[in-house]
Amino acid sequence: MKFTEKLKSLREANGFTQRQIASMLDIDVAVYNRYEKGERYMKRELIDKVAAIYHISADELNKYWLAGQVYSLLYKEENAKEVINMVAEDIVEYGINKMVEE
């Protein structure tokens, strides 16, 4: 499930309108609408707010957000699967903390 789909699924499952969620996030409803449609990327700072609205783990929601960011970088690349495998190997070999230090 993509981040955009997760946003919509959470909103609908909790019975909120886009207008209500936008108001809780203090953003324009048109901006929120674009988040759900995948026409605009949500700022990372909003992840905690969204998680709090739905009473879910920010870490879990952040995984969807990060996956969406990776997807947005690679979706047009012919060798996307190879690149993802290389990154996965680097994480296993060097550890994510080592990669962040570099």
Question: Whereabouts are the PLM-identified features?
Answer:
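Short amphipathic helical patch at the helix-1/turn junction of helix-turn-helix
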Residues: M1, E12-A13, Y41
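Short basic helix-loop element that most often maps to the first helix and adjoining turn
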Residues: E5-M24
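Conserved hydrophobic/aromatic packing and binding residues within compact polymer-binding modules
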Residues: L7, I21-A22, Y32-Y35, L61
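Helix-turn-helix DNA-binding elements, focusing on the entry/boundary residues of the two helices
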Residues: L7, Q18, V29, R44-I47
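Recognition helix of helix-turn-helix/homeodomain-like DNA-binding domains
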Residues: L25-Y41
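DNA major-groove recognition helix of helix-turn-helix/homeodomain DNA-binding modules
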Residues: E45-E60
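Short, charged recognition helix plus adjacent turn
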Residues: N62-E102
